[in-house]
C-alpha cells in the first residue's frame, strides 16, 4: 500500500512540475525533479525513479524485471548531495553519496554516484541521462 501511495505522490509531483507556468525557471524545475528523484530513490521506488530517466536511455538500455528485483534486495539508508555544477553543454551534474543496506546480510556500505541531467526543450523538462545508480559496482 505504501508503495502505491509513494508512486501516486511521485506522479502528482511530476504533474505539478509539468503544469508549472512557463515563467518558472529551468533551475527551479530541475530542483523539483531532483527532489522527486531523490525521494523515490530514498524510499526504494526505483520504478518511479526510472520514469525520470531520459526516454532515449530507457529505450536503448531498458531495465528488466530481474534488474528491478535486484533493487528490492537493498534498502537505502542515506542519500546525500555532495554538490554539483553546470557543464558547458548545459547539462547539470550532481555528485551523490548513497547509503545501501543489503536486506539479506544487513551489511551497510556507501556508494558514490554522479547524476547527469539535461534539459529537453521540446518536452520542457529535465531528464536524468545516466540511468539509475549502479549499487553493485565493485570498483
Predicted region positions:
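Bacterial N-terminal signal peptides that target proteins for export
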Residues: 1-9
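C-terminal motif of bacterial Sec signal peptides marking the signal peptidase cleavage site
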Residues: 16-19
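Bacterial signal peptide processing site
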Residues: 21-23
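Short, aromatic-enriched amphipathic alpha-helices that serve as compact interaction elements
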Residues: 26-42
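Short solvent-exposed beta->alpha transition segments
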Residues: 31-32, 46-93, 106
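Sec-exported extracytoplasmic/periplasmic mature domains
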Residues: 38-42, 46, 51-58, 99-102, ...
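Exposed beta-sheet edge and beta->alpha loop/turn motif
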Residues: 87-139
Amino acid at each position: 500500500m505504501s508503495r502505491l501511495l509513494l508512486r501516486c505522490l511521485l506522479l502528482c509531483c511530476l504533474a505539478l512540475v509539468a503544469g508549472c507556468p512557463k515563467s518558472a525557471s529551468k533551475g527551479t524545475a530541475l530542483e523539483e525533479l531532483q527532489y522527486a528523484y531523490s525521494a523515490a530513490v530514498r524510499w526504494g521506488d526505483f520504478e518511479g525513479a526510472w520514469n525520470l530517466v531520459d526516454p532515449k536511455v530507457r529505450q536503448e538500455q531498458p531495465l528488466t524485471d530481474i534488474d528491478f528485483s535486484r533493487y528490492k534486495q537493498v534498502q537505502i539508508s542515506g542519500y546525500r548531495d555532495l554538490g554539483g555544477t553546470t557543464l558547458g553543454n548545459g547539462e547539470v551534474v550532481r555528485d551523490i553519496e548513497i547509503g545501501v543496506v543489503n536486506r539479506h546480510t544487513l551489511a551497510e556500505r556507501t556508494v558514490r554516484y554522479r547524476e547527469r541531467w539535461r534539459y529537453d526543450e521540446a518536452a520542457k523538462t529535465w531528464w536524468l541521462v545516466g540511468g539509475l545508480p549502479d549499487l553493485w559496482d565493485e570498483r
